[in-house]
Amino acid sequence: VGPYFLSFAGDRRRVAYAPSLAHTNCRPENFDEQLVSELLSRFDFLSVREEETVPLFQTLVDAPIDVVLDPTLLLDSDDYADMASKDVLQGEYIFMYLLRECPELIESTVAMTEATGMKVAYISDKNLDIPNSINLFGVGPEEFVSLIAHASLILTNSFHATVFSVLFHRPFRVYATDKSGARMRDLLSNIGLSDRCVDVMCADDIAPCEWSDVDSRLDSLREHSCAYLRKALS
């Protein structure tokens, strides 16, 4: 595990920016506490992405552990404008992106396309049983960002699909109810969008969002994260 903790850096300054456990079922009994404590103690600055992971690691080090934004959120939609300029699909569509299997998300997608009449675009290594849908292949970062930027609705259990939905002010719903959803729950809570995290949904759930408030909160979090970097790198 040494390289993951920058063991190759010698006596140089070590800065951890927004590392993520992704899953919150990590417990001290699942790793060598003494080893991790020794490795973390070599860092000059420590931060994490999820609030829920701070108590876990704070027991291992005396240094403060900050909570900062995912690097993709340090930029705004203008910075991603070129990536989003490519039109992948024409007309209105629902973009459904599964990072992990989620039958509830697929069921809700089927219900939404039947209720709205909009087609569904999704990315998967297998065809899903969703009417009026298209499985997109060969989708790279630019196409991914563009699909979100131009979608009428995004349904996902992916953190980064959530990030770009927020940045581009798109209607979205997130399925983040399991242990792997801590990053999404933290982000949505911090920007006042916890109600976008759902178990099931229907067409009536697509309520408008007060994006000015979201942007204001995100700007504050962005400034906090940049201040952490400025301090760590100065």
What label would you give each PLM region?
Residues 1-234:
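Active-site anion-handling motifs in enzyme catalytic cores
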